[in-house]
Amino acid sequence: MFFQPIVDLSSGKMTHCECLIRMLDNDGNFIPPASFLDIANESGLMPRLDYLVIEKAMRQQVVWQRAGVNTRLSINITAPTLDQPDFAQRIAEIVNRTGADPRALIFELVETDALQDIDNARRLLKQLQTLGASIALDDFGIGFTSFEYVRELPVDYIKIDKAFVQFVHERENDRVLVRSIVEMSHGLGKRVIAEGVDSRQALEVLRALDVDYIQGYYISRPVPINALNLRTTLPD
């Protein structure tokens, strides 16, 4: 499992980081995540994979908690997992088993598939919030993520997909779209994370557009735990 910092633009400091799955082939080269995640999704293994990552992430959070580290962890959950009626119960069981602090956890709803039952998803996400966790809507603007999800689901964060972020300093249409998403999100009381920030130019535009947090290669690539700088800040 790898970790990618997410930095608060107001303080310039890392406030949380996202847990990301990475796999190597026999030659030690990285396998594109889409390749093995698509296989897991098509074979019905996504829930099992999600729960393995969730438990590992929670155990890492406990290590940080005992060391006095306040960094929050963002953990991806896919639609097939959230569609399970006992999802929130299983999360509570993992919390109890690991001793993790739910207040330090953010669950990111990843849209590899459309939700089968949005009412069930709303109920389960609210249960996670009752535990103390926060909810993020990932990849906003593409795929199955829609304004309906923003309206119907109890999310705390909106993550703008990198397709609208990487060249926001060059493309007027992207700036208009990002500005609209930020205004809508703030109007609904939600915070905004821009992912895919790969340049200083993009960072400065996003700051001017009142984005709350940024994530991307300009800050840090995903790294293993032993290479993660818990004092990551915005580059000078």
Language-model region placement:
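Glycine-rich, phosphate-binding/catalytic loops in enzymes
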Residues: 37, 90-94, 123-126, 152-154, ...
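Bacterial c-di-GMP phosphodiesterase EAL domain
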Residues: 1-100, 112, 126-127, 147, ...
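EAL-family c-di-GMP phosphodiesterase catalytic domain
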Residues: 9-13, 26-27, 61, 78-85, ...
